Design a protein with these regions (language model features):
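A broadly tuned preference for mixed-charge, low-complexity surface segments
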Residues: 156-165, 189-193, 255-271, 320-337
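Gly/Ser/Thr-rich active-site loops/lids in small-molecule metabolic enzymes
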Residues: 230-235, 292-303
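Extended, hydrophobic interaction surfaces within ordered domains
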Residues: 35-53, 269-271, 275-288, 301, ...
Length: 422
């Protein structure tokens, strides 16, 4: 995951990044605190427990920090001086391609799809292309608050908004058959994206916009670095207008618009569904209800009986620690380590960390006075990334073209297209 800046007094004083149930907080002098969460409100600093990057439970089960936290390069600087100069550059690059076309943005309400939508709304005024935001609401798992925010953004930008949703009967069927989406198998993603692609095809759109950025995740870095080197904003029918933006570019733009998502103000790193398996434990107490909690409870009880109970995990542990986010094997390891860390905290042997203190770190970049960091050219940024790749080759290329490990999954989601219009 991409490290976010910790801002205090108009200065960047460090970074914070979370992955799975770890959070890593670093200062600018190399100081580092690795936090492991054992509940939605409590965690502990576990650096002294680390053995070769792992935290072990007494029974030998362990969780590996590097396996669960992909720490991407920290970019506490801007990649362009101001929005007008970037717009001028973008129009020069894509003007001939976009003029008179239909462009669709898959809009989630998050910061990255917001800035992509904003810069294209400005470009559309100059180039005369049709811009449409398409928001796919996830039934049962996503709060209605996000829908309201998406509508607010579209109104502010003066852009047409189309709302779509996967069929509720199919989504409900998947929930009971497959359990809630979990890490490594988010069947929800296909069901969410399919209505957007169908709309794109229905209206004969020319380009589909992604707000993905280069250093958000390792997977996206591998996919986008070649395009960054080539300066390639358009690839086939895909348009990536902001994929080289840094986190500082994004925050500056979002705050200038006054369109900060409520989740960011609650201290959440990402805008996602209330039941997203990629949330960290500390995020759940600041997450909005969906109104379908009784239904989800039934789903959770079923999958607990089928796949997790035999792993020695209690129902309370499964529910309170949101262990459905993991495969049963991974959940067993996490639960053992969490129990061990919690006991050490109760004995006073580890420093306890409250979830509210980490949420406050994430919130700072949305409310504190913003710093005025340096501006780096794309060539300078690419050179930094080249050095990072050279220093982290094993990590960057680990798992590339590796065989599937689906045997560790609790099951494999099956997308049955013929039932889509059910």
């Amino acid at each position: 995951m991409e490290p976010y800046p910790i801002i205090r007094g108009g200065k960047v004083v460090g970074s914070v990044v979370s992955g799975s149930d770890f959070t890593i907080v670093e200062d600018l002098h190399g100081g580092r605190r690795t936090i492991l969460w054992f509940s939605s409100e409590r965690g502990a600093v576990v650096d002294r427990l680390l053995v070769d990057g792992r935290v072990y439970a007494p029974n030998g089960l362990y969780v590996d920090v590097e396996q669960w936290v992909e720490v991407m390069p920290f970019q506490p600087y801007h990649s362009f001086s101001d929005i007008d100069s970037y717009l001028q550059w973008l129009v020069g690059v894509v003007g001939d391609v976009l003029r008179g076309k239909k462009v669709v943005v898959g809009f989630s309400g998050g910061k990255d799809s917001l800035v992509a939508s904003y810069i294209l709304s400005l470009a559309s005024e100059k180039l005369g292309f049709k811009l449409i935001l398409v928001y796919s609401h996830v039934p049962f798992l996503e709060s209605e608050e996000n829908r309201g925010f998406v509508e607010k953004v579209a109104n502010r930008l003066g852009v047409e908004l189309v709302e779509v949703e996967p069929p509720k009967p199919i989504f409900r069927e998947y929930m009971f058959r497959e359990g809630l989406p979990y890490r490594g198998t988010r069947w929800c993603t296909y069901l969410k994206v399919r209505p957007i692609r169908e709309f794109f095809k229905k209206i004969g759109a020319d380009y589909l916009v992604s707000g993905d950025r280069l250093v958000e995740t390792l997977k996206r870095f591998r996919r986008l670095i070649g395009a960054a080197v080539k300066g390639q904003i358009v690839a086939g029918k895909h348009l990536r207008p902001t994929f080289t933006w840094t986190i500082m570019d994004v925050v500056r733009c979002v705050r200038s618009l006054g369109l900060v998502h409520p989740d960011y103000l609650r201290g959440l790193p990402r805008v996602s569904c209330s039941w997203c398996p990629y949330k960290c434990l500390f995020e759940f107490t600041a997450t909005q209800a969906t109104g379908w909690e009784d239904l989800i409870e039934k789903v959770l009880r079923r999958e607990y009986r089928l796949w997790y109970q035999q792993r020695g995990i209690s129902w309370d542990e499964f529910r309170e620690r949101r262990l459905w986010r993991y495969t049963p094997k991974a959940a067993q390891a996490w639960n053992a380590v969490m129990n061990y860390v919690e006991k050490l905290v109760e004995k006073g042997e580890l420093e306890e960390v409250k979830a509210s203190s980490v949420r406050e770190l994430y919130k700072r970049m949305w409310v504190e006075e913003l710093p005025n960091p340096p501006v780096k050219t794309l060539d300078e940024i690419l050179e930094e990334l080249r050095k990072w790749v050279e220093a982290n080759r094993d990590k960057v290329f680990a798992g590339v073209n590796a065989p599937s490990t689906s045997s560790t999954h609790r099951h494999r989601a099956r997308i049955r297209a013929e039932k889509w219009n059910h």
